[in-house]
Amino acid sequence: MENLNVDMLYIAVAIMVGLASIGAAIGIGILGGKFLEGAARQPDLVPLLRTQFFVVMGLVDAIPMIAVGLGLYMLFAIS
């Protein structure tokens, strides 16, 4: 029975990290598309838009890093 719990833990970690990565990739893709739309409409605002783009991209990318940290904690500390 212990082996089944460890296997379920591995699956849970894989799903958690995988879904977080997919969500971040979709979010950054949408964000990049909107940045390009904004830059095409208002070329004068590109420096301001670029700064905001990188800040929000960092925040969107932080969620999968937290999920990876929690997944590694679950994988090595709990099992």
Curated annotation (Swiss-Prot):
Its main location: membrane. The chain crosses the membrane at residues 11-31, 53-73. The record marks 61 as: Reversibly protonated during proton transport. The keyword Ion transport applies. It is a multi-pass membrane protein. One of its GO terms (molecular function) is proton-transporting ATP synthase activity, rotational mechanism. InterPro entries: ATP_synth_csu_bac/chlpt, ATP_synth_F0_csu, ATP_synth_F0_csu_DDCD_BS, ATP_synth_F0_csu_sf, ATPase_proteolipid_c-like_dom, F/V-ATP_Csub_sf. Keywords: ATP synthesis, Cell membrane, CF(0), Hydrogen ion transport, Ion transport, Lipid-binding, Membrane, Transmembrane, Transmembrane helix, Transport. NCBIfam families: ATP_synt_c, PRK06876.1. F(1)F(0) ATP synthase produces ATP from ADP in the presence of a proton or sodium gradient. F-type ATPases consist of two structural domains, F(1) containing the extramembraneous catalytic core and F(0) containing the membrane proton channel, linked together by a central stalk and a peripheral stalk. During catalysis, ATP synthesis in the catalytic domain of F(1) is coupled via a rotary mechanism of the central stalk subunits to proton translocation. Key component of the F(0) channel; it plays a direct role in translocation across the membrane. A homomeric c-ring of between 10-14 subunits forms the central stalk rotor element with the F(1) delta and epsilon subunits. Belongs to the ATPase C chain family. F-type ATPases have 2 components, F(1) - the catalytic core - and F(0) - the membrane proton channel. F(1) has five subunits: alpha(3), beta(3), gamma(1), delta(1), epsilon(1). F(0) has three main subunits: a(1), b(2) and c(10-14). The alpha and beta chains form an alternating ring which encloses part of the gamma chain. F(1) is attached to F(0) by a central stalk formed by the gamma and epsilon chains, while a peripheral stalk is formed by the delta and b chains. This is ATP synthase subunit c. The gene is atpE.
